[in-house]
Each structure stands twice: as structure tokens, then as C-alpha cells.
A protein has these predicted regions:
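Positively charged n-region of N-terminal signal peptides that target proteins for export
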Residues: 1-4
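Hydrophobic targeting/anchoring helices
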Residues: 19-127, 136, 374, 416
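Catalytic cores of eukaryotic secretory-pathway lumenal/extracellular enzymes that build
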Residues: 183-184, 198-199, 206, 218, ...
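Extracellular ligand-binding/catalytic regions of CAZymes and related secreted enzymes
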Residues: 20-26, 32-63, 243, 341-419
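Catalytic beta-strand/loop cores that center a nucleophilic Ser/Cys/Thr
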Residues: 127, 134, 231, 250, ...
């Protein structure tokens, strides 16, 4: 009988402890599919399971429940993962919670509903956000002017804007592309939409859309914009009630002395900018640094700021990466003149040599906005008509990771910021 008890004791304590969590590491050494890792995190949230985002732990790793379904899905998508025991999980969480560590575990509660503001037809340029959402297998809904004016933004938690022009100047493409079929088509469609919506000018339509987006953010929504959507949005708000469009855009001259009538109090991020008056110049204002940059491609990088994960979890979430040095990339709006960024706005990524802000974040009312300069993080100088980037060649792109940080940010359990 004594031998039987000994045998039972050995069997009982030799059974392996069942794992309770799956760790998706996000450091440079362990993960080969950083972008798809965001997709599996979103997919887990869709299953109504909670996830912990381990800020500053191994590149901003994710802690998921241990289920066979999640492990199988990780294998299908080629995502590296580690199965953790209860004791190992507790050890990691204790490390993260230590006051001596600049780390934090943030709970992600639900999959955010994502809207992408984009014309329904194809455009002669790519959209970095729709490409990375598709690659990461994160679902989104395309909406445009008609849906925004019908208050359908209220159905979504997160709104993306990319290569857009909210000023009614058709992207300032007049000089180079006014005879191009796509330009003529886009102009006619915009004019028809303006009339259908009850406006006599496209600039009036775009202002109405901008005001709806502003109200969406003020009411608690999250807006993420890239490239020309960033500065043209603020310009449209600042120029409310002022005609800044020349005759080739709206069939009448611009308003005399319009620069003096610009109201910087209306903007989200920018101040004291000077508008580009010439319709022949591919530029909206002095906000953008594209033509003023003095740096060559080979050394064009920007640096992510470092924040206290425990005291400032929001910007910490938005800068999670496996490197703090990000390759620069250009766009119609590449970066922002630091002196024209409002003091209330956080500069999360900067190119110090040129005095450029590349990646900025702010609060508006109950909501948040992030502006990210440049067009495509893996195409240094994307031009009209260029082939789209194949993200299969860049599965761990640090520049694209910043976009996906913003996608998951609305999923975080809201906790009052301490600073």
C-alpha cells in the first residue's frame, strides 16, 4: 500500500502544469510577423476575449488567453508565440508592475469598429492604412462624404483619413494632372456629390464633412490621419466661412486678404501657418516640410519619444515598437514644422536635424487624434501611378506598426491619465 501512495504522489506531481496564456512577443528577435500579430490580437477581441498589451515588454508584446483555436490561428498566420504557465505569466506581470520598470499591462476589452474615409472608386495611389489592415486581416468599412453627412460616423470607434483634401482644391494636383482622366473624373464626381448634398461648391461640401469629423472626435471618437489629410483638415477648419479657392477650383476668385481671416483657434493641431496661394504649387501651407527638408534618403530617420508607461499609457501605447528609430518616408505632407504645432499637442516622433514633427497626438473634447506625416512607410517617395507596396516583403515594418498601434488604442480599457 505504501508503494501505491508513493506511485500516486509521483504521478500527481509529474503531470505538467497546464498553460494559461499565450504570449505574442513583439521584439525584433522573436517575431517575424509583427503586423499580423495585431490582426490576431484584434481577432481575439472579436471573440469577446480580453487581451493584455504589455507596454515596453519585449517590444510591446500581447498576452492572450490560452485556447487551441488561438494557437491554431497563430500557426496559420505564421505568427510566433510562446505558451506560458500560470507561474511564468505571474512572474512577467509582477516584473511589469514593479515601480522600477518602465512597463505597464493595459487591458484591451473589445474590437474597435473601424471606418476608412475613402472614395468608393480606385485612386492612382495606394493607402497605407487599408493595405496594412488588409494584410493584418483586420476588418474595416469604407465610408465617404455621403455617409459622414448622414452621421454614420457614430457607428464607429475609429476613423482613418489618408491622402485627402478637405479644402476643395482637389489635392493641389492642378498643375501636373488637370488633363489626366482620373483628375477630371474625380472633380466631376466631387462636384456632383456637392450638388446632391445641397452645396454649390466642393469646398463647402468638404467643410461640412470636416465639421462632422470634428464633432465626432469632440464627442469621443478617435481619428487617425496621414499625409495630406492631416494639414488639409486643419486648414479647412481654420478657413471656415472664408473662400481660399481660386477660380479653377470653384469658378470664382478667392477672397481678398483671406490669410488674415484664418482662425487658428478652430484647428486640432496646427497654428500660425501661411497658406500657399498659388494653384500651380503642389502644397497647401507652411505646415508641411517636404520642400524645406535638407536630408538625403540614406540618413532620413525619425526618433520615437520615450514615455512613462505607468503615468502616460496613451502615448506609450502609440509608440510601441521593436525599434525607436523609424525610416523616414515622404508624401504630399511629409512632416510638420515644429513651431507650427500647438503646445497642447504631443510630438511622439521627430526628426531633430530638420526640426520636423513626424508623428503627433492630441486630445479634442472627449476624443483623440493622431497625425502621421508621409504617405507609405515602405515606399520612400510614392508617386501618382506607382505600384502599391507588397507588405509580404515588409511583415515587420516599424513604420507600419505605428499605424496598427492606433488601431488597437480604442480597444484599451479607459483609465484616467495621470499627467
Amino acid at each position: 500500500m505504501r508503494h501505491l501512495y508513493i506511485l500516486l504522489f509521483i504521478l500527481l506531481f509529474s503531470v505538467p502544469v497546464s498553460a494559461s496564456y499565450i504570449l505574442i512577443p513583439m521584439d525584433a528577435e522573436s517575431q517575424t510577423e509583427h503586423l499580423k500579430a495585431y490582426g490576431i490580437t484584434y481577432w481575439t477581441l472579436e471573440k469577446q476575449l480580453k487581451v493584455k498589451w504589455l507596454l515596453n515588454y519585449r517590444g510591446g508584446s500581447f498576452l492572450l488567453p490560452d485556447t487551441e483555436e488561438i494557437k491554431k490561428e497563430c500557426q496559420i498566420r505564421g505568427i510566433s508565440f510562446e505558451v506560458l504557465s500560470n507561474s511564468k505569466t505571474e512572474e512577467i506581470l509582477n516584473l511589469i508592475s514593479s515601480p522600477s520598470q518602465n512597463m505597464e499591462a493595459v487591458v484591451l476589452e473589445k474590437a474597435p469598429r473601424i471606418a476608412v474615409y475613402s472614395p468608393k472608386g480606385s485612386q492612382p495611389w495606394d493607402d497605407a492604412v487599408t493595405m496594412v489592415l488588409t494584410y493584418a486581416e483586420i476588418p474595416y468599412t469604407v465610408i465617404y462624404d455621403e455617409e459622414v453627412l448622414a452621421d454614420q460616423l457614430l457607428l464607429f470607434d475609429w476613423l482613418h483619413l489618408h491622402h485627402e483634401d478637405f479644402t476643395g482644391q482637389y489635392g493641389k494636383f492642378y498643375r501636373a494632372y488637370r488633363a489626366a482622366p482620373w483628375y477630371i473624373k474625380n472633380k466631376k464626381e466631387a462636384e456632383a456629390m456637392a450638388v446632391k448634398s445641397g452645396y454649390s461648391k466642393v469646398s463647402q461640401l468638404k467643410l461640412a464633412v470636416s465639421l462632422k469629423i470634428r464633432d465626432y472626435v469632440v464627442g469621443g471618437g478617435f481619428m487617425f490621419a496621414m499625409c495630406s489629410a492631416t494639414d488639409s483638415f486643419d486648414i479647412a477648419l481654420a478657413a471656415e466661412g472664408v473662400d481660399i479657392c481660386e477660380a479653377m477650383f470653384d469658378e470664382d476668385p478667392s477672397e481678398a486678404g483671406y490669410q488674415s481671416k484664418i482662425n487658428y483657434n478652430n484647428t486640432f493641431a496646427f497654428k500660425d501657418f501661411i497658406l500657399e496661394r498659388s494653384p500651380m504649387v503642389y502644397e497647401f501651407s507652411s505646415i508641411d516640410m517636404t520642400s524645406k527638408r535638407k536630408i538625403i534618403k540614406e540618413i532620413d530617420y525619425f526618433t520615437l519619444m520615450d514615455y512613462s508607461a505607468k503615468w502616460d499609457p496613451i502615448p506609450t501605447m502609440l509608440v510601441q515598437n521593436h525599434t525607436s528609430l523609424i525610416k523616414g518616408f515622404m508624401g504630399q505632407t511629409t512632416s510638420y514644422a515644429r513651431e507650427q504645432v500647438k503646445a497642447s499637442v504631443l510630438i511622439m516622433g521627430e526628426q531633430k536635424t530638420n526640426g520636423e514633427a513626424r508623428y503627433i497626438h492630441g486630445i479634442k473634447g472627449k476624443g483623440f487624434f493622431t497625425f502621421y506625416g508621409g504617405h507609405d512607410p515602405e515606399d520612400y517617395q510614392h508617386r501618382v501611378g506607382d505600384a502599391k507596396t507588397e507588405l509580404e516583403l515588409h511583415p515587420s515594418s516599424p513604420g507600419y506598426r505605428l499605424i496598427l498601434n492606433n488601431v488597437l488604442f480604442p480597444a484599451a480599457k479607459k483609465k484616467k491619465q495621470k499627467t
